[in-house]
Amino acid sequence: MCCNYYGNSCGYGSGCGCGYGSGSGCGCGYGTGYGCGYGCGFGSHYGCGYGTGYGCGYGSGSGYCGYRPFCFRRCYSSC
């Protein structure tokens, strides 16, 4: 499981989850502790950031945008 509470990382600058250029997963971006971040995306399947299919941030397909608590919950439920 890519996105978790244990600090596992598969992207740079992320505390947990998937980061820059990841294939799938959700989690953290640049400098975030957990949840939805800014740099999680660029082709990630579930995540946050630019061009994501589901999640939060700029250009998300399903409209779960912004820096709201729902954004965090969505990322974990997506995983």
UniProtKB/Swiss-Prot annotation:
It comes from the Eukaryota. Keywords: Keratin, Repeat. GO terms for cellular component: cytosol; intermediate filament. Interacts with hair keratins. In the hair cortex, hair keratin intermediate filaments are embedded in an interfilamentous matrix, consisting of hair keratin-associated proteins (KRTAP), which are essential for the formation of a rigid and resistant hair shaft through their extensive disulfide bond cross-linking with abundant cysteine residues of hair keratins. The matrix proteins include the high-sulfur and high-glycine-tyrosine keratins. This is Keratin-associated protein 21-1. The lineage of its organism: Eukaryota, Metazoa, Chordata, Craniata, Vertebrata.
